Swiss-Prot record:
The gene is pth. It comes from the Bacteria. It is found in: Cytoplasm. Monomer. Hydrolyzes ribosome-free peptidyl-tRNAs (with 1 or more amino acids incorporated), which drop off the ribosome during protein synthesis, or as a result of ribosome stalling. Catalyzes the release of premature peptidyl moieties from peptidyl-tRNA molecules trapped in stalled 50S ribosomal subunits, and thus maintains levels of free tRNAs and 50S ribosomes. Belongs to the PTH family. It is an enzyme of class 3 (hydrolase). This is Peptidyl-tRNA hydrolase. GO terms for cellular component: cytoplasm. SUPFAM superfamilies: Peptidyl-tRNA hydrolase-like (SSF53178). One of its GO terms (molecular function) is tRNA binding. Keywords: Cytoplasm, Hydrolase, RNA-binding, tRNA-binding.
Length: 195
């Protein structure tokens, strides 16, 4: 497996979106930055908030795009191109409708599953889908017509606790990824379910 050199947390910019389910990826990157003792700063060259962190002796770039979700690839493409980072060296954290709150999973490759952030990243990486994803479960409203309002809404307190617990576990699993490997990180994260 390639070493991860860029970790991206997908989000919509602005205070009105900060606590919405669609920003779960950003919550994970912010927690990772806190653990690493770094602060993300705005960098217009990469259309996002960025930081350089060190995890178990390995350099990694952190990125939260400040474009809207459907333009996330602009930020990812700009940073990846500048630092010559390949898709296999990228981990993108995003909210996942198909997993319940309290569950998170790593995955390599695959489609975008209707997620506009992933869709744009795939397009900007020359249709290369072969990047890693961290899928953070937010649950599904039950009706596909309600998805937009659901992802742009805030989770009730109990659901938010479950999402936060899964993010904490995802951060610990990311440390295992950098210290050991993806298989061990997956084994740990995929056996976790917050109650």
């Amino acid at each position: 497996m390639s070493e991860i050199k860029l970790i991206v947390g997908l989000a919509n910019p602005g205070a009105e979106y900060a606590h919405t389910r669609h920003n779960a990826g950003a919550w994970y990157v912010l927690e990772l930055a806190r653990i690493c003792g770094v602060t993300l700063v705005a960098d217009s060259k990469y259309f996002g908030l960025t930081a350089r962190a060190v995890l178990h002796g390995k350099d990694v770039r952190l990125l939260i795009p400040t474009t809207y979700m459907n333009l996330s690839g602009k930020a990812v493409g700009a940073l990846a191109n500048f630092f010559r980072i390949t898709p296999e060296e990228i981990l993108v954290a995003h909210d996942e409708l198909d997993l319940p709150p309290g569950v998170a999973k790593f995955k390599l490759g695959g489609g975008h599953g209707g997620h506009n952030g992933l869709k744009d990243i795939i397009a900007k990486l020359a249709n290369d889908k072969n990047f890693y994803r961290l899928r953070l479960g937010i649950g599904h409203p039950g009706d596909k017509n309600q998805v937009s309002g659901y992802v742009l809404g805030k989770a009730p307190a109990k659901e938010q606790e479950l999402i936060d617990a899964a993010i904490d576990e995802a951060v610990r699993s990311t440390e295992i990824l950098f210290k050991q490997d993806m298989v061990k990180a997956m084994n740990r994260l995929h056996s976790f379910k917050a109650e």
